[in-house]
A protein has these predicted regions:
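Two-component/phosphorelay signaling modules centered on CheY-like receiver
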Residues: 11-34
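Receiver (REC) domain active-site loop signature in two-component systems and cognate sites
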Residues: 60
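Conserved acidic carboxylate
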Residues: 8
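Acidic, metal-coordinating helix/loop segments flanking the phosphotransfer/catalytic sites
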Residues: 35-53, 96
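Active-site residues of response regulator receiver
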Residues: 57, 87
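C-terminal output helix
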Residues: 111-120
Length: 135
């Protein structure tokens, strides 16, 4: 089963992401979506990993997505975890900054469930549902 941490302050966007991930037919082993409504909450949830992927917004109260990515990349236990940014910040500069801080992908909102699913599978190790067991 895949474990994906979704960090997004908008409840409707978290629900959209969850539904897109859970409805993807490529996930025959299932997806465990763990939700955080802020960067601070994500920091509390990271030790409960491991996660196969972290999906994060940039603009959030307290700790923003870029600060979260910096923390993840400095963390010995999470530094190899792929990170996907989902954001309304659409300039080339915003995208370059997120990727230079260690994000593996960057989607500009709004996007379709299919675009999200394709990007998620691109970022997963080997691009398959054969994720490591969690326990």
């Amino acid at each position: 089963m895949l474990r994906i941490l979704v960090v997004e302050d908008s409840a409707s966007m978290r629900s959209f992401v969850r539904n897109a991930l859970e409805s993807d037919s490529r996930s025959s082993a299932g997806v465990d979506v763990v939700e955080a409504s802020s960067g601070f909450e994500a920091l509390r949830l990271l030790p409960r990993g491991p996660y196969d992927l972290v999906i994060t917004d940039i603009n959030m109260p307290d700790i923003n997505g870029l600060e979260l990515i910096s923390f993840i990349r400095k963390s010995e236990s999470h530094k190899a975890t792929p990170v996907l940014i989902i954001s309304t910040q659409s300039s080339e500069r915003d995208r370059a900054r997120g990727l230079s801080l260690g994000a593996n992908g960057y989607l500009i909102k709004p996007f379709s469930p299919e675009v999200l699913q394709t990007e998620v599978w691109r970022l997963l190790p080997n691009g398959t549902a054969q994720a490591k067991p969690h326990g």
